[in-house]
């Protein structure tokens, strides 16, 4: 399964601020939210169609009063939208205090856009920016997968990695997640793996985005692999802990076994690390050990 990591809202904001004078008025903590697309939504009924990670644009034609606008904002946040752009002027002249207070509390970004801005141009410009970013991320993901599954054919992936300033000796942080097939109950056997993997990958992507870390997350067979360009240290530990916590949240739905790579992982040995961490995940399942470190690999081979 391929779920391409999207653009970070903060990057969109930097572009829209200079090109369209878009201003942030609340919810700055959410600027690291990922954005898949830009949608114009004017009615509450359409919120239920959102998939999450959308930047919503509205003129407020249907939410003119404070109570309706606050309800609209809450529904967007609960639907997983990344932020809201209000085209102020004709229908909404200012963002109500109650909306600002709520957005600050939950970290949901609210922006204002001058009425003079043509929304068609605004939406198209930002969607093009998102598409370009996703193409770049997609090429990086493809190259890293080739470094794992076709590692001898360096000419197919090293030029792309060089474009991203990644070389054979670049240190890589790698985490492998294993989701065994089947289960003991009928519910486990009937489990929808596709939706589960989709949601788990998106949550992992958001963890890296919040940490300002360049990363790739992909699924192959019963494994989800996380690869990030991050130097050894406390930040690796924090990310590993968050992924472990995430797996605990999902473990009620499906059992997850995690193997965390050591500090010697580089692009040149990525394929070996993938093999070793996959084995360690399966060993963890046998020992009912949900989280394993690569340093345990030697012990696992004694069993």
PLM features per residue range, with description:
Residues 177-179:
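Flexible glycine-/small-residue-rich
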Residues 1-172, 185-221, 225-227, 231-260, ...:
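Alpha-helical/coil-rich non-catalytic "connector" segments in signaling and regulatory proteins
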Residues 259-264, 272-287:
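Cyclic nucleotide signaling catalytic output domains
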């Amino acid at each position: 399964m391929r779920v391409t990591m999207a653009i970070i809202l903060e990057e969109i904001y930097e572009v829209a601020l200079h090109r369209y004078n878009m201003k942030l008025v609340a919810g700055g903590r959410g600027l690291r939210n990922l954005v898949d697309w830009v949608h114009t939504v004017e009615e509450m009924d359409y919120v239920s169609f959102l998939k999450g990670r959308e930047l919503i644009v509205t003129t407020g034609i249907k939410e003119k009063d404070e109570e309706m606008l606050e309800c609209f904002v809450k529904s967007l946040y609960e639907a997983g939208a990344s932020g809201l752009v209000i085209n102020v002027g004709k229908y909404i002249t200012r963002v109500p205090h109650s909306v600002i207070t709520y957005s600050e509390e939950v970290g949901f970004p609210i922006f204002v856009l001058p009425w003079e801005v043509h929304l068609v141009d605004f939406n198209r410009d930002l969607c093009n920016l998102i598409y370009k970013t996703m193409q770049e991320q997609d090429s990086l993901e493809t190259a890293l997968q080739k470094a794992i599954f076709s590692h001898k054919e360096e000419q197919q992936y090293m030029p792309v990695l060089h474009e991203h300033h990644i070389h054979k000796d670049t240190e890589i942080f790698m985490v492998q997640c294993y989701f065994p097939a089947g289960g003991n109950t009928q519910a486990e056997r009937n489990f929808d793996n596709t939706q589960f993997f989709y949601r788990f990958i998106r949550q992992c992507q958001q963890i890296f985005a919040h940490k300002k870390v360049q990363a790739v997350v992909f699924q192959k067979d019963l494994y989800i692999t996380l690869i990030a360009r991050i130097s050894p240290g406390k930040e690796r530990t924090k990310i590993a802990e968050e992924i472990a916590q995430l797996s605990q949240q999902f473990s009620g739905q499906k059992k997850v076994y995690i193997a965390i790579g050591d500090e010697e992982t580089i692009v040149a040995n990525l394929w070996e690390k993938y093999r070793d961490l996959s084995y360690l995940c399966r060993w963890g399942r046998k020992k009912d050990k949900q989280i394993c470190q690569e340093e345990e690999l030697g012990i696992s081979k004694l069993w």
